[in-house]
Amino acid sequence: MAAGTVCFYLVEGQMEEKAVKILKGNYILSGKVSVLHQRKISNTLLRLIPRKSKVIIVFDTDAADTEHTLYENLNMLQRENIETVLIPQVNNFEDEIIYATSIKNIKELLNSKSNSDFKSDFLKEKNCLKKLEDKDFDIYKFWSRTADKSSSFSKYENRSNKIKKL
């Protein structure tokens, strides 16, 4: 990465925000994190992004109706000459965790009572990184896949290798 370049993560939701925060430094490049919740980048947020930035957009591929918003956000960043790195989550954050660890079901990671309890358990957990590493977390697998060819997101190349400390 060029000297003076700042990473700015725009993520899907709170779980991705926490993931970036726990992975940065050890596994991925450090940077600021903002949650988009599948919304268009506001002018206010755009002004907060430094000129020499690398914007990393982490997005789910299981909601086809959000592809147009992603497309608009990319165009906005390109008009501002801001470098972008796209990271599709196939299909969502939980599926990425399962793929990158030795667990078969997401509730196994934190011994959640149910899959639906996992989100709140993950957000409350103080030792997420250790829990991931205890389940054989593999950064080479995490955020490494591309969307299925039948998905409207398949045209977006996964460039997670640009932010991983390999």
Q: How does the language model describe each region?
A:
Residues 2-3, 17-31, 44-56, 63-166:
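C-terminal accessory helical subdomains adjacent to catalytic cores in phosphodiester-
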Residues 13, 61:
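Residues immediately flanking
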Residues 41:
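Nucleic-acid-processing active sites and adjacent nucleic-acid-binding tracks
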Residues 8-12:
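Short hydrophobic beta-strand that contains or immediately precedes a catalytic carboxylate
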Residues 34-35:
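A short, aromatic/hydrophobic, helix- or strand-capping loop or linear motif
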